[in-house]
Amino acid sequence: MKKQVTFKPFRLSPVDHSLPKVYIFKSLYFRGVDDTGSLSRLQDGIDRLISCLPFLSGEVVPCADIPDKVGVLQVQMPCPSLQEIPMLLVKSYPNHTWPAASTSERWRNTALLDQSYRPLPDFIPPSKPRPVLRFQANFLADGLMLCMGYNHSVFDGTGAGNILEMLADCCRANPNSILALPTNGDIESELRGLLSSPGVAVANASQEAYAINCAHTEVEPEPSSAMLYCWPFLLSSEKIECLQEACNSLLPHIVRLYSGTQSSLINQDTNWPHILSSNDVLTALLAVSIEKAREATGALGHMSRSLAMAVNLRERLKPMPRHYLGNLVTTVWVSHHRPAVKDLETMVLPVPACNRHEIDRDDLLWITHVAFRIRLGLNAINEEHIRGLIHYLHSQDDWEQIGIHFTDPIFISSWRHLKVYELDFGPTIGHAEHFEMDVGTTDGVCVVMPANTRAVGKTKKAPWDIRIVLNPEVLQALIASAIFGWAMVKDAST
């Protein structure tokens, strides 16, 4: 039996406490891989990863020795019952296959992303041991599905993507070689401590806004909903670029309009956008398309006209490195209502982009308006804002009651930057052909999946692979809508 690598307990950061206390699952599919050679390589790679980052084998528990604080969590060595659960579980499903991309039906002999393929449940109550992370290797009739389940209080999606990168390095490396990973347990503990230090957490005047953004919601296991479907879509990268170009041609006019009126919704010291990114435009397209589909089916009800978008803070806060594994994310709120300013149409009417026959002018104005507000919100999330957010979270007495607000009618999160398709796990395993993650069953959730650059080659941009959760009537209206249908490569499930 291997000797267990030990580590010192460390407290989770205030930002770690702001994420839902659930387990998230990411699955990689390797076609044609069986357990001959691949299982030992995978096990050796995981063992090597744990030896470099021993806290991955730990558990999340309450931390009782913090004065004037309750609900604080820490990572510590696993209890005896968790030590009996291997880091890599192995199961065989010789009659199951990975779902074909060309079918919308989930047949009985198809490997569904359900609990049997996962190493952990979706939710573990505080009364039971809560591991940091586990893997499960599912050997199917046509390949290997590797599922990683991780505690969202310890990692965000980017951090989990970094773990997969390091696992690939560990699996691919020669067993006798010296492997230099970008981080280790000591660095991770130090960085989480840094996020709680006075040098990072600095108060500012936006405490009221932070309080609204950090409203607490209870996390319970979600009941399965027969009325909500998660549907895959592929949107053309060329169409999104075309839309981006059209929106950017309108941007100077919108900036001039808002800077002239100085709407009460816009701060006086606004950092006006100079350019809209493809992600700004894609997010706006999703928001407008879903709004129109809900409107067409009478599903809007009393929903607010706002969206929440997850924002990775790693590159916005010095000196946090790209490879930091912990949670470092917040949300930006944006109104996606139709433009109310009557002068807008007159101002931009002469702009050639408004006369593209394939894009309705009103839709283009609406999308540009929302993309402008998205970029405006992102520009406001600077280092001062982030330090103020961390100060607000740290100043709360009950850390169990803090949380980033993720309950808007539309919530959009992008993992397009994750390199899962580029990872080489070495001989007998190779590169993943497909990646999937459970996006839950919350109405209005949109997840942009990692870009499959290997499928299109180096000369082309990968299409935007998206999962959208809506009720079936709204989904059908979304597919039938002119602007969304124009952007689609195809419905990725048919």
UniProtKB/Swiss-Prot annotation:
GO terms for cellular component: cytoplasm. It holds the Pfam family TRI-like_N. The gene is easN. Induction: The expression of the ergot alkaloid synthesis cluster which leads to the synthesis of fumigaclavines is positively regulated by the brlA and stuA transcription factors. Ergot alkaloids are known for their toxic effects on humans who consume contaminated grains or livestock that graze on grasses harboring ergot alkaloid-producing fungi. Due to their strong affinity for monoamine neurotransmitter receptors they may also have clinical uses such as treatment of migraines, Parkinson's disease and cerebrovascular insufficiency. It comes from the Eukaryota. It catalyses: fumigaclavine B + acetyl-CoA = fumigaclavine A + CoA. Belongs to the fumigaclavine B O-acetyltransferase family. Monomer. Its EC number is 2.3.1.205. GO terms for biological process: alkaloid biosynthetic process; ergot alkaloid biosynthetic process; fumigaclavine C biosynthetic process; secondary metabolite biosynthetic process. One of its GO terms (molecular function) is acyltransferase activity, transferring groups other than amino-acyl groups. Keywords: Acyltransferase, Alkaloid metabolism, Transferase. The keyword Cell cycle does not apply. Fumigaclavine B O-acetyltransferase; part of the gene cluster that mediates the biosynthesis of fumiclavanine C, a fungal ergot alkaloid. DmaW catalyzes the first step of ergot alkaloid biosynthesis by condensing dimethylallyl diphosphate (DMAP) and tryptophan to form 4-dimethylallyl-L-tryptophan. The second step is catalyzed by the methyltransferase easF that methylates 4-dimethylallyl-L-tryptophan in the presence of S-adenosyl-L-methionine, resulting in the formation of 4-dimethylallyl-L-abrine. It is an enzyme of class 2 (transferase). Pathway: Alkaloid biosynthesis; ergot alkaloid biosynthesis. This is Fumigaclavine B O-acetyltransferase easN. The keyword GTP-binding does not apply. The lineage of its organism: Eukaryota, Fungi, Dikarya, Ascomycota, Pezizomycotina.
